[in-house]
């Protein structure tokens, strides 16, 4: 029931804000770099590196870092996806929301317990919903939340 309600909510939001949304385009996923970065191919733009907007997953050297990448691969490896461009980051990567049909992949990574909501950068209205999904994953102890004290990747990177 919850999945159905969420799907309908996202369709409603997408329809309501479509004219206001960022540029969206179709592409084929050619590789998954890690849990929050992919490479896609689009005939107009060629190969493009995409950083998933609003989330941060464990780094490869952290517990659940490789698992986050594998989970993302299981969702979209080789798939045709829609990329909704939000911005470009300081590394020149496109930052966007990735959709596989009606599934918001960024949101799904949080729901499945493989990503934190990146509070520093997630400033869209739907980010509050993602925070609820993160809290649910934490309380259900799924994904990275199986660890007793998971270290957020931004803290882990700062320590390195």
Where on the chain are the PLM-derived regions?
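Small beta-barrel nucleic-acid-binding modules, primarily SNase/OB-fold domains
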Residues: 2-16, 20-160
